[in-house]
Amino acid sequence: MTRLTAALAFVMLSAAAQGADAPPGAASCSGCHAANPRVETPVPPLGGRPAAEIASQMAAFKSGERKGTIMDRIAKGFSEEETRAIAAWYEQQK
């Protein structure tokens, strides 16, 4: 129960920490990926990564070129414009 509580608190705090300037959809990423590149998460943090890299990886998941546990399904839910906006926002999170 303690792990579950800690995990839920982390997700809620991560989403809240993104602030109002985050584009729609960015909060869904923070459940697994941290916006802060100095936070350790089981999957790579997105904060500070080049936008082109993030967008490219999302496109690879979306097309099926890159396999993932759930990223292929998540990527399909975003348009190219949404993906670019999310990627640009995460690049600025340093």
Where are these regions (language model features)?
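Sec-dependent signal peptide recognition
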Residues: 1-8
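Electrostatic cytochrome c docking/interface patches
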Residues: 10-26, 39-44, 55, 60, ...
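Short, conserved glycine- and acidic-residue-centered signature motifs
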Residues: 22-25, 47-50, 79
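The canonical Cys-X-X-Cys-His
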Residues: 28-36, 86
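Short acidic-aromatic loop segments in the C-terminal HATPase_c
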Residues: 30-33, 59, 91
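Gly/Gly-Pro-rich "capping" loops immediately C-terminal to redox-active cysteine motifs
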Residues: 36-66, 72, 76
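C-terminal capping alpha-helices of c-type cytochrome domains
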Residues: 57, 75-94
